[in-house]
Amino acid sequence: MGTVPAGSRRAPGCGEGMFILCLALLLAPGAPAQYSVDDFGGLGRMFDGIGAISGGGATSRLLVNYPEPQRTEILDYLFKPNFGASLHIFKVEIGGDAQTTDGTEPSHMHYPDDQNYFRGYEWWLMKEAKKRNPAIKLIGLPWAFPGWIGYGKNWPYDFPDVTAYYVVSWIIGAKQYHNLDIDYIGIWNERAYDIKYIKVLRHTLDRLGLTNVGIIAADGDWGIAHDVLIDPYLNEAVQVIGAHYPGTHAAQDAIQTGKTLWASEDYSTYNDEVGGGCWARILNQNYVNGNMTSTISWNMVASYYEQLPFGLEGLMTAKEPWSGNYVVSTPIWITAHTTQFTQPGWYYLRTVGHLDKGGSYVALTDRLGNLTVIIETMSHNNSICIRPPLPEYNVSAQNATFYLQGSFQNLQELQVWYSNLDINNTKPVTFKKLTPVKVQNGSFTLQLGVNEVYTVTTLLTGQKGSFPDPPKSKPFPLKYKDDFSVRNPPFSEAPYFADQSGVFEYFTNTSDPGDHVFTFRQVLTQRPITWASDANQAISVIGNYQWSNITVTCDIYIETVETGGVFVAARVDQGGSPTDRAKGIFFWVFADGTYKVTGDLIGEIVLCKGLAGVRARSWHTLTLHVDGTNASGLLNGSPLWKEVVTGGPLHGWAAIGTSSFEFTQFDNFMIEAKDPE
């Protein structure tokens, strides 16, 4: 008996004499379309796994400050096999000291003679991922670079050996200090690639014995594929061609290379049922339409202040460490439909494709007799991703019969997992185990509604993991203080502060044996090679974006003589990539003895100014009080200015920062806010 091509409407066993009868039966109302699941004619491409990204930037910033057991629970939902998302791949930002969407992530080398492999939280996250799944693949990708790499230019490629040394040092540090083996490394996220640099990077990796580290290029569009086709040395250097938000289609040049193709960043959509529908559709159709064998979500967990760009666009949400509340969102369970029933190294079958009345199906095997089929019927309006635009199409309810052939023809029963994401449902169904389906005469039939996901599999290992409900959501505390007195901090950043320009770190002030031994310090002294339009000022935000009436107090220590400057702020209305456009109330003092009150971060909207008598290298206390339309400021407990009309945003975060990239210390930070409700 011949095989039935995917989407064929001819049933097995229809000989020439019975063709008219068979055709009539197939075209009868409600007759199921028929699809083959067959490995007899060979297999498709090898499956590389489903993954997610931390970074690009600071998307996991608040996660590290969660209390236990909630922090462990969140990590289990993300990484634990056969429990939640069960991710196969984990991609992190190689911090470059610059704003990369929702904040800055610190570099392991702020300066040429500086190496510190404990900054930030990506090392910790990679270890937590490996702890739960030792087989998870790890990827590092720079979004930005410390300024010294560019030798004064906003460009990382003029000295490719220097950039390669910097990136490879991160890989070596991961192994030396954390016993982490990095599997893949990228070039420069969504920015220009440089062919010479890619070759130098490959040579450097090989020379240092890192031949197993693959290069992914170029984390933008498919443009590098043309260069790979015409340059045999580049072709040899690149292991994976990765594109972002490909709309489920790969360029012909990319397919022609014969290389592994990935959607190396995708999704980036609000994590409700529509976001889940987006994720379900592209997880299947990135392979069906584009031969992409891995899809990686930006971002993994929305663990940053919601009012920053792309709020709630993670697979799940964990944005309230002060309350312990988190939300296991729909995309977690859509991920599980694939990840819990496949592994990297499985193979797609050639018999994959689109369903007759809309939707798609893929089938994968471990070549040891196991089979997993994932089916999605996402409608257009229930699966719109943030980008690119989605052309209109129709999906309707349908019956589908799947014929198991080749090595699967003797299967008798398959496990079934089901989700219904229809936005009109008051209670969507996610990842529900149904009664196993019996295979009769080598086939099984499903009644497929619209906006449904089915996983049909030989594997018995699926689980919808759960924990007791987390604590209820509550806003940031109205009173909060931090004296930064942590002798051995587990992380380099103080809780809840979200750096938006510059890098703020715990600091031990050995020159001050008194009250300011342990402080919080802005440590960048040079503008980084940026990914966004970074501010020239450093700023870290904290608190509740809805705060309006507030008092912010902080001890400050300017280290730069004559030109140094520092601020405390309230009602800061912008973070992320547009931080340089932030408005609010900013109270500045400078090492030249002056002060200034501005309505913006860049200092163009001057509300008042005068003499303060502040000098560098001594501690002072700044207090900013904002109430209604008026603001006032105190220096060392005495009024310096008062009743300045604000005229700017009505609410926003509290913040601290510096007038340039310069060393400055902060201590005894305190907030007292009135309930915005």
From Swiss-Prot:
Q: What class of enzyme is it?
A: hydrolase
Glycosylated where? Answer: N291, N370, N381, N394, N399, N424, N441, N509, N549, N630
Q: Name one GO biological process term.
A: galactosylceramide catabolic process
Residues annotated as binding substrate are T101, W143, N189, R387
Naming one, the record's GO cellular component terms include: lysosome
GO terms of molecular function: galactosylceramidase activity
Q: Tell me what reaction this enzyme catalyses.
A: a beta-D-galactosyl-(1<->1')-N-acylsphing-4-enine + H2O = an N-acylsphing-4-enine + D-galactose; beta-D-galactosyl-(1<->1)-sphing-4-enine + H2O = sphing-4-enine + D-galactose; a D-galactosylceramide + H2O = an N-acyl-sphingoid base + D-galactose
Looking up InterPro entries in the UniProt record yields:
Aldolase_TIM, GH59_C, GH59_cat, Glyco_hydro_59, Glyco_hydro_59_dom, Glycoside_hydrolase_SF
- For whether the record's keyword set contains Signal, the answer is yes
User: Does the entry annotate any disulfide bonds, and if so which pairs?
Assistant: C278-C385
Q: Please state where this protein is localized.
A: Lysosome
UniProt keyword Lipid metabolism present: yes
The residues forming the signal peptide are: 1-33
**What are the catalytic residues?**
E190, E265
Q: Which family does it belong to?
A: Belongs to the glycosyl hydrolase 59 family.
Task: State what this protein does.
Answer: Hydrolyzes the galactose ester bonds of glycolipids such as galactosylceramide and galactosylsphingosine.
Q: Provide the protein name.
A: Galactocerebrosidase
**Source species:** Xenopus laevis (African clawed frog)
